[in-house]
Amino acid sequence: MASWIFKLLLLLQCVLVLIQHADSSSIIRYLPGFEGPLPFELETGYIGVGQKEEDQLFYYFIKSENNPEEDPLLVWLTGGPGCSSFSGLVYENGPLAFKVETYNGSVPTLVSTTYSWTKVANIIYLDQPVGTGFSYSRNPFADIPSDTGSVKRVNEFVRKWLAKHPEYFSNPFYVTGNSYSGKVIPAIVQEISNGNYICCKPQINLQGYVIGNPVAYYDHDKDFRIPFAHGVALISDELFESLKASCGGSYSVVDPLNTECLKLIEDYDKCVSGIYEELILKSKCEHTSPDCYTYRYLLSEYWADNETVRRALKVVKGSKGTWERCDYRVLSNQDIKSSIPFHINNSIRGYRSLVISGDHDMTIPFLGTQAWIRSLNYSITEKWRPWMILDQVAGYTKTYANKMTLATVKGGGHTLEYKPEENSVLFKRWISGQPL
């Protein structure tokens, strides 16, 4: 009985939201926490996708500060699944960031950045899959999101967004993102490309994609954590050699009868339990402490949960409870097991791709990224070399015949935020066709 009452209440809430809202967009000139008018053009809104447009995907669109009529148009997808694109906007490559200071109960302070990709590109920061950030579903009984469902919905979103903003149809278009979205993005590129070939006019001026520390195939990616840990002196030679001998190089899917391998993996887990895997150089600490690096993530949650902020962003009232930067309750059917077939298809069609890898990320180690790129068997057009900023090594790069570029970021982590200036230089060079 109680469960039916709960479902009825959910249904009533959705009816109220439905009454309030259809596809909408608003120009935002001021944001709580930022002093004065915004120094860039921001639009927020919803686009309905899926059956009867039940899924309302929320976005932040920021015009290029250079030449928006001609500069590339990007859609940015944060990983998770379940992490809001607002995380990319304020922590990775957007024109705003939070001033890191102890929360005092007021609206957290926003400041301008120097490294935003919007210096040279128009960017749509998209909250997806549904349930992420401020996106929501009108149907409380909707199916659990899936990788393949996300592919179709992002494609639908992009086409509908461009129909409402036809002045951007001719701009070079790229799909961008990091972490888990790196597994889905190549499939989205293929879906958009298929639409261009098969059905949809006007065509999207699709040029390629950018993925940072991307998931390619989870079991494959995880298998490289132990070799990475050994390479950076987190585990001993003896433990590493024993793991190789007992587990045969497969550490993520282990035969339950192989007790020796399982015991050695337990020993490995103990060795690295105090390591912050997203950037092994950072301290692993309690995120509620202002001295902890991840404390800054709380500021976005305090900010987005403020009612004044929601009104400023034109968030539909009643559509979202507590906002979370990464809501891992947004379950997803991970039905794309590997991105590799999509990379192959996209390269055959001539799309450019940039794969960025922070070299101190143990979540998706650069060793695994290099391995799956090697498996594509692309010929090399430019051998491994350092790329530089002001005569200093910022990372290493290699270019392939099929328009794929791999670039590591020295001292970088799982996302762009750990080296935002270096990642900005890297992106600006690549997107303009300059050598890295």
From Swiss-Prot:
This is Serine carboxypeptidase-like 15. It is found in: Secreted. GO terms for biological process: proteolysis. Belongs to the peptidase S10 family. It holds the Pfam family Peptidase_S10. It is an enzyme of class 3 (hydrolase). Glycans are attached at N104, N306, N345, N377. The keyword Glycoprotein applies. Residues 1-24 form the signal peptide. Disulfide bonds join C83-C326, C247-C261, C285-C292. The keyword Plastid does not apply. Probable carboxypeptidase. Its EC number is 3.4.16.-. The active site is at S179, D361, H414. Keywords: Carboxypeptidase, Disulfide bond, Glycoprotein, Hydrolase, Protease, Secreted, Signal. It comes from Arabidopsis thaliana. Its main location: secreted. Expressed in seedlings and roots. Gene3D superfamilies: alpha/beta hydrolase (3.40.50.1820). PANTHER family: SERINE CARBOXYPEPTIDASE-LIKE 14-RELATED, SERINE PROTEASE FAMILY S10 SERINE CARBOXYPEPTIDASE.
